[in-house]
Amino acid sequence: MSTPDSTLVKAFLLDLQNRICNGLEALDGAAQFAEDSWKREEGGGGQSRVLTGGAVFEQAGVNFSHVMGASMPASATAHRPELAGRSFEAMGVSLVIHPKNPHIPTTHANVRFFIAHKEGADPVWWFGGGFDLTPYYPYLEDVVEWHQSAKSLCEPFGEEVYPKYKQWCDEYFWLPHRNETRGVGGLFFDDLNKQGFEQSFAFMQAVGNGFLTAYAPIVERRRDTEYGEHERQFQLYRRGRYVEFNLVYDRGTLFGLQTGGRTESILMSMPPLVRWEYAYTPEAGGPEAQLYSDYLKPRDWLNL
């Protein structure tokens, strides 16, 4: 297995953060990101960038973090107990975009690198990441295009890659207490290292670079779609699912909180406004009901 180079990974991640922020500012056309650099007492730090009150994006956050610690936290060793007690280094770019218009989907993306050290032993390392889409209104064209973009970036790495990571995404972003997916999925991968450092890093780069290519056309297509208070209230209600998932199930959120990460940056994924409604039921025959019946479950979007 080729030797991992964390300096190379960090340089890519910092550049990716810049490129995504520039792309989102161009899409929004009105607001700019504010940057907040921070340091962590135990080692490392990061830079959080948040855009608020834009013409298109109500809130968008794009975080870079690079943290170190003397021992792996429980969230990272739950499925790899042999790593308990190792020192670690973790770096990544994580972003969540909450658009203003309910016809534009919310989206999340993340690419990350972990390396764990122990004296007298080879380092243990892996890449993880992915991206997923959470529409509020059912536009089949958007979902198919999103998954086609995901499949296209996977193809150079093997025919089996897209179906594998698409399924993993469906399984990961599942809310058991709601019996529904968080959205329409995309890609999710973790523990990637068997192909060696260069190939694993290349795939992580493809996912990071492919995110905006997949999302920008959907934003452009829906940004001028008219909406009223009814659609806005439904969007705020559905945002509640985002909060439920991130605070109850998301491994990244738990990892950040357990490692003494920066709370403001970790909770940047939360929507700026959200509402809950007791025993909500969508009106039969409406687009909201179609979202529930046709979109909030795993589907093969490229073979309908």
From Swiss-Prot:
Record's keyword terms, sorted: Cytoplasm, Heme biosynthesis, Metal-binding, Oxidoreductase, Porphyrin biosynthesis
SS bonds (residue pairs): none
Main enzyme class: oxidoreductase
Span list, region Important for dimerization: 242-277
Short name of one Pfam family: Coprogen_oxidas
Pathway where it operates: Porphyrin-containing compound metabolism; protoporphyrin-IX biosynthesis; protoporphyrinogen-IX from coproporphyrinogen-III (O2 route): step 1/1
One Gene Ontology biological process: protoporphyrinogen IX biosynthetic process
Sequence positions that bind substrate: 94, 110-112, 260-262
Sites annotated Important for dimerization: 177
Any one annotated GO CC term: cytoplasm
Catalytic residues (UniProt): 108
Compartments in which it is found: Cytoplasm
UniProt-listed HAMAP family: Coprogen_oxidas
Family as reported in the entry's similarity comment: Belongs to the aerobic coproporphyrinogen-III oxidase family.
Entry function: Involved in the heme biosynthesis. Catalyzes the aerobic oxidative decarboxylation of propionate groups of rings A and B of coproporphyrinogen-III to yield the vinyl groups in protoporphyrinogen-IX.
Annotated protein name in UniProt: Oxygen-dependent coproporphyrinogen-III oxidase
Species the sequence originates in: Shewanella pealeana (strain ATCC 700345 / ANG-SQ1)
Lineage: Bacteria, Pseudomonadati, Pseudomonadota, Gammaproteobacteria, Alteromonadales
